[in-house]
């Protein structure tokens, strides 16, 4: 083959290869464009427009990136839309309670800027648990912390942090409040926030970060609510509110709320004589609350709320071992399933209990007359028998000599059952500890367990000699 023929042959082969490559590139381009248009069902968006899933509210978004011949195709996987919680699973069977969380707020205040608080509680959305408290508009290491023993001021706000995160300066102030309750319906948070004059206070209902409704004090005597979580079932949330005397007849109402709007109000009915600071839990298809009788009884009132027909039934925890403080000692205390026991009825403290068949789990201070120590136990037949005093599975949460305070319940939905948890407020400062001028708290949290557990004590632990005065 002469040189000219070689050149012609090489050129022909090169041209053929180039032509094949050209058509391959065209085929790849056509394939890419076809896949792109097929993804959006041939509805091509304008340039730079993001195609959203339906529904357009995307709460947990996942984007999958696919690389194809240097062309990026974004494929959006639509999450399951948020649904209202119905709490229809059974209650978990437990043997006792295991440690869950402790925020150490007072100890941390010795060297950092931590809010002065009281009336803490815990509530969970479907993914996380949060701690709440009523702040005093100041940090502890601040002269404004003087005289924060006062319950109601215009500076108090509801604080919210992820559980275990102390209320630092970056904490969100959810609303203005000196009394509150919060709960998540499966789609958004509802906050009930009470503030204003003692004789003309306002309750604001904030849903998904927006003020939706409000109600004014109906008895003009310190409108107040639960100081723990409310409960939502299938989009309807219930909250117990009281207005009137703290040591006599008061006017208690149960409000039914849907996405922040009050849709119905029921008046307390049944045999409960005085109801404050209820600790409520879902008891499908309704809601059950165990409250504080600040007038006649050291046995705790019960409220059963029917979500569907808005009916209310009230009574008292039967257990012969009673849960309020002050109370008689266990050997001489008595109870009644329908009426207050008329033993050490004046004053009291927020607390909790929940039914377990005919039995009852409860928590209370160890000291019968003051807010010292904290214990939990199960009373056999305590939900059905007023003479029941058989106590099992007792646990010490805070030793007898250390301060405690309010306590309350919150519920956590698991894969197969609903667990009950509780928190204990660990109050420090005035009135009892006069070496400082402030009053604040930390918290400790336990949750029900079907496993084994040990012993211990989890007090606040701050040395007031190391604290700001």
Residue ranges of model-derived segments:
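Blade-level signature of beta-propeller repeat domains, shared across WD40, Kelch, NHL, RCC1
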Residues: 425, 436-469
């Amino acid at each position: 083959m002469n040189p000219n023929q070689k050149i012609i042959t090489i050129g022909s082969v090169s041209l053929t290869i180039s032509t094949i490559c050209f058509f391959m590139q065209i085929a790849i381009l056509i394939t890419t464009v076809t896949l792109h248009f097929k993804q959006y069902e041939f509805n091509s968006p304008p340039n730079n427009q993001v195609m959203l899933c339906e529904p357009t509210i995307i709460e947990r978004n996942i984007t999958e990136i696919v690389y194809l011949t240097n062309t990026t195709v974004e494929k959006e996987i639509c999450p399951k839309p948020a649904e209202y919680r119905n709490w229809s699973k059974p209650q978990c069977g437990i043997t006792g309670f295991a440690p869950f969380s402790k925020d150490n707020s007072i100890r941390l205040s010795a060297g950092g800027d931590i809010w002065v608080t009281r009336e803490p509680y815990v509530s969970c959305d479907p993914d996380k648990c949060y701690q709440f408290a009523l702040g005093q508009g100041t940090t502890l290491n601040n002269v404004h912390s003087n005289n924060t023993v006062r319950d109601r001021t215009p500076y108090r706000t509801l604080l919210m942090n992820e559980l275990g995160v102390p209320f630092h300066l970056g904490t969100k102030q959810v609303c203005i409040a000196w009394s509150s309750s919060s709960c998540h319906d499966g789609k958004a948070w509802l906050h009930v926030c009470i503030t204003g004059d003692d004789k003309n206070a306002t309750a604001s209902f904030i849903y998904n970060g927006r003020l939706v409704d409000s109600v004014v004090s109906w008895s003009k005597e310190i409108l107040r609510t639960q100081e723990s979580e409310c409960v939502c079932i299938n989009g309807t949330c219930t909250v117990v509110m009281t207005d009137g005397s703290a040591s006599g007849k008061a006017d208690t109402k149960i409000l039914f709320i849907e996405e922040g709007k009050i849709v119905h109000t029921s008046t307390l009915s049944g045999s409960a004589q005085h109801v404050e600071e209820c600790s409520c839990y879902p008891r499908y298809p309704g809601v059950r609350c165990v409250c504080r009788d600040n007038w006649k009884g050291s046995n705790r009132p019960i409220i059963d709320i029917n979500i569907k027909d808005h009916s209310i039934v009230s009574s008292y925890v039967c257990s012969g071992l009673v849960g309020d403080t002050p109370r008689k000692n266990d050997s001489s205390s008595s109870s009644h399933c329908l009426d207050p026991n008329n033993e050490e009825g004046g004053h009291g403290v927020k607390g909790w209990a929940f039914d377990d068949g005919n039995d009852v789990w409860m928590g209370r201070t160890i000291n019968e007359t003051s807010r010292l120590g904290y214990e939990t136990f199960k009373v056999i037949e305590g939900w059905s028998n007023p003479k029941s005093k058989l106590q099992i599975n007792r646990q010490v949460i805070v030793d007898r000599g250390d301060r405690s305070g309010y306590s309350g319940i919150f519920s956590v939905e698991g894969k197969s059952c609903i667990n009950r948890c509780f928190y204990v407020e660990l109050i420090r400062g005035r009135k009892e500890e006069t070496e400082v001028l402030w009053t604040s708290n930390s918290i400790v949290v336990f949750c029900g367990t079907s496993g084994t557990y040990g012993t211990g004590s989890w007090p606040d632990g701050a040395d007031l000699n190391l604290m700001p005065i």
